[in-house]
Amino acid sequence: MAVEIELKARLDDPAPVKQRLFSLGTYCRSYGKSDTYWAAGGNPSSEVRVRREIDTEADGRVWEKTLVTYKIKEIRDGIEINDEREFTVSETGPDEAGGDVFEGLLNRLGLRPFIRKEKQGWAWTVGTPPVLAELSMVKDLGWFLELEILAEEKDERIIAESRKRLLSLLETLDIPPEWVESRPYTEMLKNGKA
């Protein structure tokens, strides 16, 4: 079971952060992510995300995939700790309707789409063990930097160390801690608040 430990910070100007990430980290890819969130009767514990993603790797290879994710989310002091489960419905080349077929199944099971999110940006890894840094333009919300560490288990010591590393990297990137956004994107999009 992988546990995501992550934070996101709102940015006014992504250019200086992008420049610092190129000097601090290893560039991985550019991406476009189109997410549809599904739930049964507004029940948050039934939420499922279907993500259609196109990645252009640093070496120029292009990947298309449809991922399905559900998670148990906890937020502590602006840091998300997610027990995330994810699987691929289709990968590489055209979607071949894999995502459409899966969304048809969700519909038959009584789930309905309740929010959509579009995100484009770039990804780097920084340090060892790696922190994934994604610089994203989220449609209708603006620019964000997301920093994420994957842990093997939900251990309090590991969570505390990871939180410290994420906040330290935020400081290295000259991003004030008050720019950390603790609300999930879905909440911001639902409430129409950027």
Segments (PLM) and residue ranges:
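N-terminal strand-loop-strand beta-hairpin
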Residues: 1-129, 176-180, 184-194
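A short, polar/proline- and glycine-enriched secondary-structure boundary/capping micro-motif
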Residues: 78-83, 145-146, 157-159
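Conserved, surface-exposed functional patches that form binding/active-site neighborhoods
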Residues: 109-156
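Mixed-charge, glycine-accented linear interaction segment located at domain edges/termini
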Residues: 154-184
